[in-house]
């Protein structure tokens, strides 16, 4: 999940600003949701998709998932709050490395730096199981 870069490149300055504001409003609504919100991640979680996952209370991933914030390599940065949320979650040094190097990291590395909470074979099933057993404190 993320933005279609062809669409982004076609936006005027005012349209790009509005797109960023709408994305920020959505991510903030997810962050403020009164119950835990789980991101079940499989495949690629990049850019805006990573911003979405960062807005959630918990991130559960499959073993083959790949994460990254490659905007710097593409000459852009998402405006959906990832640049603020990622350092809070993984620390300034790890976030800076992800932003500047713009390299993809594995699920195992994401777990090591605290980007994800668990690696499981069935992220969706695990998220549903955890939601059904809500009672853990919320984390951001």
How would you name each of these model-derived features?
Residues 1, 10, 100, 112, ...:
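Phosphate-coordinating loops and pocket residues in cytosolic domains that bind phosphorylated ligands
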Residues 1-27, 45, 73-75:
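Glycine- (often His-adjacent) and acidic-residue-rich active-site loop
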Residues 4, 52-53, 110:
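Hydrophobic/aromatic residues within transmembrane alpha-helices
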Residues 21, 81, 105:
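Conserved active-site and cofactor/substrate-binding residues in soluble primary-metabolism enzymes
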Residues 26, 30-32, 40, 46-99, ...:
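CoA-thioester-processing core
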Residues 60-65, 107-140:
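C-terminal long alpha-helix characteristic of the crotonase
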């Amino acid at each position: 999940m993320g933005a279609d870069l062809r669409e982004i490149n076609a936006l005027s300055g005012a349209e790009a600003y509005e797109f960023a504001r709408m994305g920020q409003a959505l991510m903030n609504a997810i962050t403020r949701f009164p119950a835990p919100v789980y991101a079940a991640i499989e495949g690629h979680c990049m850019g805006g998709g990573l911003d979405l996952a960062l807005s959630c209370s918990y991130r559960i991933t499959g073993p083959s998932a790949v994460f990254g914030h490659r905007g710097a390599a593409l000459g852009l940065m998402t405006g959906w709050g990832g640049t603020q949320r990622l350092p809070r979650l993984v620390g300034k040094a790890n976030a800076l490395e992800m932003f500047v190097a713009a390299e993809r990291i594995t699920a195992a590395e994401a777990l090591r730096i605290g980007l994800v909470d668990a690696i499981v074979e069935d992220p969706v099933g695990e998220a549903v199981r955890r939601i059904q057993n809500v009672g853990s404190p919320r984390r951001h």
